[in-house]
Regions:
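A short beta-loop-alpha structural element at the N-terminal edge
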Residues: 2-17
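Conserved beta-strand in the GNAT
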Residues: 50, 56-64, 69-74
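A short, internal acetyl-CoA/4′-phosphopantetheine-binding micro-motif in the GNAT/acyltransferase core
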Residues: 73-81, 108-109
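Conserved active-site alpha-helix within GNAT-family acetyltransferase domains
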Residues: 86, 110-127, 132
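A short helix-loop-beta-strand connector motif used in the catalytic cores of GNAT acetyltransferases and
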Residues: 39-50, 69
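Conserved GNAT-fold acetyl-CoA-binding loop/helix
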Residues: 16-43
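Conserved acetyl-CoA-binding loop-helix of GNAT-fold acetyltransferases
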Residues: 81-94, 120
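Conserved GNAT acetyl-CoA-binding A-motif
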Residues: 96-109
Length: 149
């Protein structure tokens, strides 16, 4: 059975497994994103979703309403290019813009599949973030146009 559902605290071990399995945008130290960080983002700062196949989390996304950004969107490498990320992305942005009209942003490394994914999804580049990441933004108006495509 396949489903996208709201992430809960019990999903955090599988969320961490997905986060640490990616080939791009890897963490220099897997301990940088703790279970407590995940819990805070899915219970207090925003909301998260998991893409589950037969009880196994193969992707997840988390939106942060406090900083108006996408905190995470990751898919296991063997499930990339199968629509998992797109579905998680769309559910997350639909929810985000139901909560606020504030422009949402994210950062990702240049020259990655993630960069291409966000460009294709309609995100607009608007500078840099952190250590050389590309900063992308999505407005509520742009999202309403992108969704109709």
């Amino acid at each position: 059975m396949i489903m996208i559902r709201e992430a809960c605290i019990n999903d955090i071990p599988q969320i961490q497994r997905v986060r640490n399995a990616v080939k791009e945008n890897t963490l220099s130290d897997p301990g940088l994103v703790t279970d407590m960080d995940c819990e805070e983002f899915i219970t207090q700062r925003g909301k998260g979703w998991v893409y589950e196949m037969s009880g196994r989390v193969v992707g997840f996304s988390i939106a942060d309403l406090r900083e108006y950004n996408i905190w995470a969107l990751f898919v296991l490498p063997e499930f990339e290019k199968k629509g998992v990320g797109k579905q998680l992305h769309d559910v997350m942005l639909d929810w985000y813009f139901m909560q606020t009209a504030q422009t949402v942003w994210l950062g990702t490394a240049p020259g990655t599949r993630a960069e291409a994914f966000y460009r294709k999804a309609g995100w607009e580049e608007c500078g840099t973030h952190g250590k050389g990441e590309i900063r992308f933004e999505m407005t509520i108006a742009k999202w309403s146009l992108v969704k109709r495509r």
